[in-house]
C-alpha cells in the first residue's frame, strides 16, 4: 500500500489530533504517503483532500478538537454517496483509509472495505459508548474536564447551601456522569442505564439536609436521561424545597487539551491502524482491552466477535451494546452517606 488517507467523523473528541499525527508519522516511517480528508465523509465526497506531511502535524499533539474538522454526513449511508467518495479516493490514488469516530463512522469504514478500499476504525468519542473497546479516545479528557467543573460547582454549592443538578454529555451512556460524579464526590448520579425514582431523589436531598449530614447536595445527570432544567422541575413537582439550581456543562466537556492518557492511547491506536493497512487489512476496528490493543471485525456475527450485524432487511444492529459500569453507581451510593 503506497497511499492512505485519514479522516475524523462525528462529534469531535480530545485526542483525535494525536491519532491523526500518529497515522501520519507512522505511515511516513513506512514509506507510505498520507492524505487528510477535511470534514469527514462530507469532505471525501466533495474531494476536500490534501497531502499531509510531518510539518503539518508537528504542533497538533496537545490540541483539542480535530484540525481535520468533522461533520455528520448521513448521505454516506447511501450507495450513491459511497460511490462518489470512492471516486474521489481513486483520483488521489488512495488505497486505504483510517476512520476516527463513533458507530456511524465505523459503518462508513465497513462500506468502504466492502467496495475494495480497506478501512480501519479508531474509537473517537468522549461518550465512551463504542463497542469493542474499554475506553475511547477523548473519554479520559472529558472526565477530567467535567470533574474540574464539578469541583468548582461543589465550592459554590457549599458556600450557599444549595442543591445543584449538573447535566453532562452522554446521550446513550452514563460513563462520563459516573466517573466524573465519583471523582468529584457527587451525592447522586443519574444515568440512562439505571432506573430512578424522582421521589427517592427528592427524599435523599431532604433527609440529607434535615439530618445535618449534608450542607449542600450535588446531582450529576447524564443528558440521555433528560436535561438539567427538566429534571429540576420534576424535583420541585415531587416536593423538593431546597435552594435548587440547574446547570449544563455542555460542549465545554468536548474541548481542551487531551490528557496524557488520551494522547498515548490515540498514538498507540493510530500507529497500529497503519500497520493493519500496510498488511491490506480493513473492515476492522482497533480498541483497547485489559490495557492491550485488540482488533474486532466491524461487520459479522456476535460469535465471530464482530461489532455489528445485518438483519434480514439490511438494518445494522449492535451485537453487544455498550453499558456503563453500574457497579460504579453502587460505589457512589456507598460513598454518598445517604440512606
From Swiss-Prot:
Positions with a binding annotation for substrate: 125-127, 162, 169-171, 223, 245, 251-254
Ligand binding (ADP): 185-187, 214-216
Gene Ontology annotations of biological process type: canonical glycolysis; fructose 1,6-bisphosphate metabolic process; fructose 6-phosphate metabolic process
Catalytic center residues: 127
Pathway assigned to this chain's UniProt record: Carbohydrate degradation; glycolysis; D-glyceraldehyde 3-phosphate and glycerone phosphate from D-glucose: step 3/4
GO cellular component, one term: 6-phosphofructokinase complex
Positions bound to Mg(2+): 103
Annotated control of activity: Allosterically activated by ADP and other diphosphonucleosides, and allosterically inhibited by phosphoenolpyruvate.
Sample GO molecular function, one term: metal ion binding
Catalytic reactions of this protein: beta-D-fructose 6-phosphate + ATP = beta-D-fructose 1,6-bisphosphate + ADP + H(+)
Binding site for ATP: 11, 72-73, 102-105
Enzyme Commission code: 2.7.1.11
Cystine pairings recorded for this chain: none
Functional description taken from the UniProt entry: Catalyzes the phosphorylation of D-fructose 6-phosphate to fructose 1,6-bisphosphate by ATP, the first committing step of glycolysis.
Similarity field: Belongs to the phosphofructokinase type A (PFKA) family. ATP-dependent PFK group I subfamily. Prokaryotic clade 'B1' sub-subfamily.
NCBIfam families given in the database record: PFKA_ATP, PRK03202.1
Oligomeric and partner information: Homotetramer.
Protein name, as recorded: ATP-dependent 6-phosphofructokinase
Gene: pfkA
Amino acid at each position: 500500500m503506497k497511499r492512505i488517507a485519514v479522516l475524523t467523523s462525528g462529534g469531535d473528541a480530545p485526542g483525535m489530533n494525536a491519532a491523526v499525527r500518529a497515522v501520519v508519522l507512522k505511515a511516513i516511517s513506512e514509506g507510505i504517503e498520507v492524505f487528510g480528508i477535511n470534514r469527514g465523509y462530507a469532505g471525501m465526497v466533495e474531494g476536500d483532500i490534501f497531502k499531509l506531511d510531518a510539518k503539518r502535524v508537528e504542533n497538533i499533539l496537545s490540541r483539542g478538537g480535530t484540525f481535520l474538522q468533522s461533520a455528520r454526513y448521513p448521505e454516506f449511508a447511501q450507495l450513491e454517496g459511497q460511490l462518489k467518495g470512492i471516486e474521489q479516493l481513486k483520483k488521489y490514488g488512495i488505497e486505504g483509509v483510517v476512520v476516527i469516530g463513533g458507530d456511524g463512522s465505523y459503518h462508513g469504514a465497513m462500506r468502504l472495505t466492502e467496495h475494495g478500499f480497506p478501512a480501519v476504525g479508531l474509537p473517537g468519542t468522549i461518550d465512551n459508548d463504542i463497542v469493542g473497546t474499554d475506553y475511547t479516545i477523548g473519554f479520559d479528557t472529558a472526565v477530567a474536564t467535567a470533574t474540574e467543573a464539578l469541583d468548582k460547582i461543589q465550592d459554590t454549592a457549599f458556600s450557599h447551601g444549595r442543591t445543584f443538578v449538573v447535566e453532562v454529555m452522554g446521550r446513550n451512556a452514563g460513563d462520563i456522569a459516573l466517573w466524573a460524579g465519583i471523582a468529584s464526590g457527587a451525592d447522586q448520579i443519574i444515568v440512562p442505564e439505571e432506573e430512578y425514582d424522582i421521589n427517592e431523589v427528592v427524599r435523599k436531598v431532604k433527609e440529607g439536609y434535615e439530618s445535618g449530614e449534608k450542607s449542600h447536595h450535588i446531582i450529576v445527570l447524564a443528558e440521555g436521561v433528560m436535561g438539567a432544567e427538566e429534571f429540576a422541575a420534576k424535583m420541585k413537582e415531587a416536593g423538593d424545597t431546597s435552594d435548587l439550581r440547574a446547570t449544563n456543562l455542555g460542549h465545554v466537556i468536548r474541548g481542551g487539551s487531551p490528557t496524557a492518557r488520551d494522547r498515548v492511547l490515540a498514538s498507540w491506536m493510530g500507529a497500529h491502524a497503519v500497520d493493519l493497512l500496510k498488511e491490506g487489512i480493513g473492515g476492522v476496528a482497533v480498541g483497547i482491552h485489559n490495557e492491550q490493543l485488540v482488533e474486532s471485525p466491524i461487520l459479522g456475527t456476535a460469535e465471530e466477535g464482530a461489532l455489528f450485524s445485518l438483519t434480514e432487511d439490511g438494518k445494522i444492529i449492535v451485537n453487544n451494546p455498550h453499558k456503563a459500569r453500574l457497579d460504579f453507581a453502587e460505589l457512589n451510593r456507598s460513598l454518598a452517606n445517604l440512606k
